[in-house]
Amino acid sequence: MSNLIPGEIIPEQGQIELNLSKQVKTVTVSNSGDRPVQVGSHYHFYEANKALIFDREITYGMRLDIPAGTAIRFEPGDTTDVKLVPFSGLRNAYGFNSLVNGSLNS
């Protein structure tokens, strides 16, 4: 019998660096709304909730530089800096707020 457990993940020792070779942009974001806004790790930041005030043009094709499956919560009235990285792979964005629905390269 084997000691392996189906689906088990055995990580390497040490720290795993995320988005190591990606260009990082820091953007200041303010929540002008009266409710918290949460943005997930792979959400096209350009299309985030309109209550979030930031320079949208520079965030086109970018997502949060945080681990997959996590999110950042913006409380009403708060201002914070976030780090963004470019989408990789095919660089297609569908859904979200339907502002792109296609290639991020065009």
Curated annotation (Swiss-Prot):
Pathway where it operates: Nitrogen metabolism; urea degradation; CO(2) and NH(3) from urea (urease route): step 1/1
Record-listed E.C. numbers: 3.5.1.5
Tagged with keyword tRNA processing: no
Keyword Transcription: no
Any one of the GO BP annotations: urea catabolic process
Reactions it catalyzes: urea + 2 H2O + H(+) = hydrogencarbonate + 2 NH4(+)
Record localization: Cytoplasm
Gene Ontology MF: a single term: urease activity
Record keywords: Cytoplasm, Hydrolase
A single GO cellular-component term on record: urease complex
The protein's enzyme class: hydrolase
Family of this protein: Belongs to the urease beta subunit family.
Self-association state and partner proteins as the record states: Heterotrimer of UreA (gamma), UreB (beta) and UreC (alpha) subunits. Three heterotrimers associate to form the active enzyme.
NCBIfam families: PRK13203.1 (NF009682), urease_beta (TIGR00192)
Protein name: Urease subunit beta
UniProt organism field: Prochlorococcus marinus (strain AS9601)
